[in-house]
From Swiss-Prot:
UniProt xrefs under HAMAP family: Glu_cys_ligase
InterPro entries: Gln_synth/guanido_kin_cat_dom, Glu_cys_ligase, Glut_cys_ligase
Enzyme kind, highest EC tier: ligase
Gene this chain is encoded by: gshA
GO molecular function annotations of the record: ATP binding; glutamate-cysteine ligase activity; metal ion binding
Protein name per its UniProtKB record: Glutamate--cysteine ligase
Length: 518
């Protein structure tokens, strides 16, 4: 089932320097909660400055949903320490609140208890909150409080030059974009390995369903927890953030121009379902528009092609201008065993897997094959640790045992690890392979099995509160290592100044501005 990459691996072993200079970045979301595990109802902590313009700390859907962002970094340890500094400073500046350590939200009785993220009075800030109002009215607020980790990854120019010859200009843009689309197609075919190893959301509070019926065969505990005994990541299931109306958009990952055209079409395609919500009610705007996507970011995807946007530029226009610059991996649950929600082992594994995805052949995929890849993902998400579980290839009927496929993949990853270790020194990548491959013969070692044992023991609330308390105490005590207190104070002040400048620079009323942007 795993494509034969022996030739590509042999090529890599002859060109190890092609992997020197991999760049990465991390984003981590987390809900602010009270000591009793309920959602914090306070505004964004003052010490963190403006959520609209802060370089490192912002908010996602809700005012209580923090998001930490590291700068692009070539050094794993430095990046993780930077992320830890963001957590340390925040833990010291959020009063008695703490950070929820799980992907699925804390106990929230009602969706209306969730305040949307607020970004001030500038047109841009109000637009961001209106977008969230639209998300709430389309999908429900609870679903939007699910949190995850995003891992951004780019291969060095040396890799593309070794692989494609001396490239520049439009040629480079097209060849590099084609190379990243290969990564994306392989990710859709084999990325289920990520929730298998690192999925950590096998259970939910019953309140999360809001009384809606579900076809999933949940087991229930006395304390109101619903779980699936072999599930890995309910966050990635249909309970999580998926968008049924997006499934027939037909967006594919074979070609830059095709992909962008599909995305641009989706933000112009009217939706009957969302038209029923209405645009305005009693003088209050309910969504930006009633199209399938309000804006491009609404497209749900476990992985995204990206380029840093310029001022006023949409994500797709940035891609058209310069091609794909990096890949955003979006399938990581919060790691509950790390105070910062992600650890070195995971980052090193993702490095290995992304390189493998760049090397392995990836035939073009039709939108129907793309839909078929969802079958493997769903199996792993809902019953990944079930004995005897099998996976298929695309829409074909042949089936293969998951543990065997996993071990075959790791045989290749081990060779990538040897190459990366040869240029970085040490054996850190090989060690990660040896640790993780054991999860295929012993699923009890996976994150989902480990966290489920704790949840069955003490409930989701008990587990979440215990980890949150321990991490709060730990992070508050640890000294900063890279950033200094004055860096945070300076960024707070600079972010507040930037927000003020945006607010005073606006010349037209929001309603007029919105007509041009909706």
């Amino acid at each position: 089932m795993i494509p034969d990459v022996s030739q590509a691996l042999a090529w890599l072993e002859k060109h190890p320097q092609a992997l020197k200079g991999i760049q990465r970045g991390l984003e981590r979301e987390t809900l602010r909660v009270n000591a009793d595990g309920t959602l914090a109802t306070t505004g964004h902590p003052e010490a963190l400055g403006s959520a609209l313009t802060h370089k490192w700390i912002t908010t996602d859907f809700a005012e209580a949903l923090l998001e930490f962002i590291t700068p692009v970094d070539g050094d794993i340890e430095h990046m993780l320490t930077f992320m830890r500094d963001l957590h340390r400073y925040t833990a010291r500046n959020m009063g008695d609140e703490r950070m929820w350590p799980l992907s699925m939200p804390c106990y929230i009785a009602e969706g209306q208890d969730i305040e949307l993220a607020q970004y001030g009075t500038s047109n841009t800030g109000r637009f961001k909150t209106l977008y969230r109002e639209g998300l709430k009215n389309r999908y429900g607020a609870l679903m939007q409080t699910i949190s995850g980790v995003h891992y951004n990854f780019s291969l060095p120019m040396a890799f593309w030059q070794a692989k494609c010859g001396d490239i520049s200009g439009t040629d480079a843009k097209e060849k590099i974009s084609a190379g990243y689309f290969r990564v994306i197609r392989n990710y859709y075919r084999f990325g289920w390995v990520i929730p298998y190893l690192f999925g950590a959301s096998p259970a939910i509070f019953s309140s999360f369903l809001q009384g809606k019926p579900t076809s999933l065969p949940f087991e229930k505990t006395e304390c109101g927890m619903y779980y699936l005994p072999y599930a890995t990541s309910l966050r990635l299931s249909d309970l999580g953030y998926t968008n049924k109306s997006q499934s027939n958009l037909g967006i594919t990952f074979n070609d830059l121009y095709e992909y962008v055209a599909g995305l641009k079409q989706a933000i112009k395609t009217p939706s009957e379902e969302y038209a029923k919500i209405g645009i305005e009610k009693d003088g209050k705007r309910l969504q930006i528009n009633s199209n399938v996507l309000q804006i491009e970011n609404e497209l749900y995807a476990p992985i995204r092609p990206k380029r840093v946007t310029r001022s006023g530029e949409s994500p797709s226009d940035a891609l058209l201008r310069g091609g794909i610059e990096y890949i955003e991996v979006r399938s990581l649950d919060i790691n509950p065993f790390s105070p910062i929600g992600v650890d070195e082992q995971q980052v090193r594994f993702l490095d290995l897997f992304m390189v493998w995805c760049a090397l392995a052949d990836a035939p073009e995929m039709s939108s129907s094959e793309l839909a078929c890849t969802r079958v493997n993902w769903n199996r792993v998400i809902l019953e990944g640790r079930k004995p005897g579980l099998t996976l298929g290839i695309g829409c074909e009927t042949a089936q293969f045992p998951l543990p065997q496929v996993g071990k075959d993949l790791f045989r290749d990853l081990k060779r990538v690890a040897q190459t990366l270790d040869s240029i970085n020194g040490g054996e850190a990548y090989q060690k990660v392979c040896d640790e993780l491959v054991a999860c295929f013969d012993n699923p009890d070692l996976t994150f989902s099995a480990r966290i489920l044992r704790s949840m069955i023991d003490t409930g989701i609330g008990g587990t979440g509160k215990a980890f949150a308390e321990a991490y709060r105490n730990l992070l508050r005590e640890e000294p900063l290592e890279i950033l200094r207190e004055e860096d945070f104070v300076a960024e707070r002040e600079a972010s507040e100044r930037r927000q003020q400048e945006m607010e005073t620079a606006d010349t037209e009323p929001f309603a007029v501005w919105l007509e041009k942007h909706a």
